[in-house]
Design a protein with these regions (language model features):
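Radical SAM enzyme [4Fe-4S]-AdoMet core and its adjacent flexible, acidic
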Residues: 10-12, 192-330, 377
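Short glycine-enriched, charge-decorated loop/helix-capping segments at active-site entrances
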Residues: 111-115, 208-214, 372
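N-terminal pre-core extensions flanking Radical SAM catalytic domains
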Residues: 1-112, 132, 399, 407-409
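Flexible mid-to-C-terminal extensions adjoining Fe-S/redox cofactors in radical SAM and related proteins
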Residues: 7, 322-409
């Protein structure tokens, strides 16, 4: 009887309808039928059964299996790649307030319009102490809008955090901060980095999205001040069909944009046919450069296992845009006491549909991208039908999302 073995670091992952061969060493993914997966197992484990010669020859010619002196003792599992690896949380968002002076139509944080809550200085210190004790080295202070907090309190928060973390970033909207306040931060919390958002380089369009006249002028003035003061800063925007972006201005640093998550006020009303075609995960767009790196990063950098988000009410969430999951409330407690290990280990295995998909170890999960109120629903933009092993038509999906006339755009 001939014996075979897998040719290097190769894993077979089974799905509901089809299977996938992860050829890590040769940087390839092969979509195969279950008969092929069965043939691989039977061949390398030395099972006494008739092997399909055509499939066997294809496996040999593609270097999936090679002849061997003896059969393998067991099929390796792709999770073997993760042995010895650790998931260490190093970053946390701290929502110092959910109050905001803007009314951005896409904002993931809708609570600011319903329930006003800002952290007290003592609450903030407790949060910082617990994060530092847990080993968090990087934080970002966010809102709402941090500058709705009294200056004395906010500056005390910045000073306290500055002395306890390796990296600290303040994310604000740029409409309430003065040049003098920026100068104070540059002098008194020198390692602070600044982040703010600008979604259009056309005044009327930016103000339309924020729903506050004059916001564009104030934001761009802040960007100019940051550039003149030589502070470390970045600015970002979102892709939305609701406004025109215009010609990019030079504010001294690269400008980056991201797709709107369907959280808070974010909804499909911000997407048109063009944006949906960019966003949908299709057979053509499901690609990777380095399969090993992709698989390891998806496991090690799963958002729920990398971040904490502490709300202004001291509730601890796994993600800044995902509040359907919670570790618990930090008020009067230690962070180590409330951390939910099941959230830290959250993966595609927990997601409906994805748990039955053979590509689940090569596909990043983002919980805010579920379309309904079901927090375990698969991402709305994935076109792979794992139950039937086929990729859905993108035009048909766009019609479902935007209406029957959408593709005609």
């Amino acid at each position: 009887m001939k014996h075979y073995k897998l040719n290097g670091e190769i894993y077979v992952v089974r799905g509901a309808a089809k299977c996938c061969i992860y050829d890590i060493g040769h940087n390839k993914l092969f979509s195969v039928d279950k008969l092929v997966a069965d043939t691989i197992e039977n061949a390398v484990l030395g099972r006494e059964c008739e092997l399909n010669s055509a499939i066997l020859n294809t496996l040999l010619s593609n270097d999936i299996i090679v002849p061997s002196d003896e059969p393998m003792a067991a099929m390796p599992h792709i999770t073997d790649m993760f042995k010895g690896m650790k998931r260490d949380i190093e970053f946390a968002w701290i929502e110092v307030t959910n109050v905001c002076n803007l009314k951005c139509q896409h904002c993931y944080n809708e609570t600011g319009q319903k329930c006003h809550k800002a952290m007290t200085l003592d609450e903030f210190k407790h949060v910082c102490d617990e994060l530092a004790a847990y080993g968090i080295s990087e934080i970002q202070l966010i809102g709402g809008e941090p500058f709705t907090i009294p200056e004395k309190t906010l500056f005390a928060m910045l000073s306290y955090a500055h002395d306890r973390f390796k990296s600290i970033e303040l994310f604000f909207n740029g409409t309430m901060v003065s040049r003098q306040q920026l100068e104070w931060m540059k002098t008194n919390v020198p390692k602070i980095r600044i982040a703010l958002s600008l979604h259009s380089f056309i005044e009327e369009e930016q103000d339309k999205l924020t729903q506050v006249p004059g916001s564009y002028k104030k934001i761009t003035e802040t960007l100019k001040n940051l550039k003149e003061l030589g502070m470390t800063y970045r600015y970002v925007g979102v892709y939305t069909s609701m406004i025109k972006v215009g010609e990019e201005s030079n504010f001294g640093v690269p400008y980056k944009r991201d797709y709107i998550r369907l959280a808070g006020r974010g909804s499909l009303c911000h997407y048109d046919c063009k944006l949906l075609k960019e966003r949908l995960k299709t057979r053509e767009s499901f690609t990777f450069k380095d399969l090993r790196k992709t698989v390891l990063e998806i496991w090690a950098f799963n958002c729920f296992s990398k971040y904490f988000y502490i709300g202004s009410n001291l509730e601890v969430y796994p993600c800044v845009m995902e509040r359907r999951f919670s570790h618990g409330n930090l008020s009067g407690k230690k962070l180590s006491e409330i951390v939910d290990q099941s959230l830290l280990n959250f993966s595609k295995e927990n997601v409906k549909g994805c748990r039955d998909c053979e590509y689940r170890f090569a596909c990043l999960d983002c919980r805010p991208d579920s379309l309904s109120g079901d927090k375990y629903e698969k991402s709305w933009f994935c076109l792979y039908d794992e139950q039937n092993g086929v990729w859905r038509d993108s035009d048909e999906r766009i019609k479902e999302l935007l209406g029957t006339d959408a593709v005609a755009q």
